[in-house]
C-alpha cells in the first residue's frame, strides 16, 4: 500500500502542532497542503501519474530542496505573516527530510550547493525534532504575555469579590 501522502501529512502536522493553540488550525493547512502538493513534481518529472512511475525516478526533482522550502515559506510569510510562513517551510522541510531518510531515490535537499543524496533515518529524526522545537519556540515567542486575574492571584480560586477601596 502506498502511504507516502499520509506519512507526509502526519509529519507536517506534527512539526507545527505547537503553533495550533495560539495561531489556530490554519497553520496545519499552511504546513500540510504544501507537504502534499510538492509531490506533483514527481508526476511532472515522470510524465505520468502512475505510482510505479513516480516512485521509480532515478533522483527526486530539484523542487525537493531546502531552497524551494525557503522560497515557499518566504512567499507565504509575505502574504500571510511569519507564523504561516514558518508552517509552510516546516511542512515542506519535514517532507524533504522524510524523503531523504529513506533508501529510495536520492533527494536534492541542499541543491544547488550539494548533489542529491540520502541522509538516513537518524538525521531525519534529529532534524525533524529540530523543526518541532523551533515551532515550540515560535509559539512561545508569539504568545501574548500571560496575566492572571487579581482574584486568582489571591489564592481563592477566583471566587473573591473585587478589591475594595477605602
Model-derived features: positions:
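N-terminal membrane-targeting hydrophobic helices
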Residues: 1-166
Amino acid at each position: 500500500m502506498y502511504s507516502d501522502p499520509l506519512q507526509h501529512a502526519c509529519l507536517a502536522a506534527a512539526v507545527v502542532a505547537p503553533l495550533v493553540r495560539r495561531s489556530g488550525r490554519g497553520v496545519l493547512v499552511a504546513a500540510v497542503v504544501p507537504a502534499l502538493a510538492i509531490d506533483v513534481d514527481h508526476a511532472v518529472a515522470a510524465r505520468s501519474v502512475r505510482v510505479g512511475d513516480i516512485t521509480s525516478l532515478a533522483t527526486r526533482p530539484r523542487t525537493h530542496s531546502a531552497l524551494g522550502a525557503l522560497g515557499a515559506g518566504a512567499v507565504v510569510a509575505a502574504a500571510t505573516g511569519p507564523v504561516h510562513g514558518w508552517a509552510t517551510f516546516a511542512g515542506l522541510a519535514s517532507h524533504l527530510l522524510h524523503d531523504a531518510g529513506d533508501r529510495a531515490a536520492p533527494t536534492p535537499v541542499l541543491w544547488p550547493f550539494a548533489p542529491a543524496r540520502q541522509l538516513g533515518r537518524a538525521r531525519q529524526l534529529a532534524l525533524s525534532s529540530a523543526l518541532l522545537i523551533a515551532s515550540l519556540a515560535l509559539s512561545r515567542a508569539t504568545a501574548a504575555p500571560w496575566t492572571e486575574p487579581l482574584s486568582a492571584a489571591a489564592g481563592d480560586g477566583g471566587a473573591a469579590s473585587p478589591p475594595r477601596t477605602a
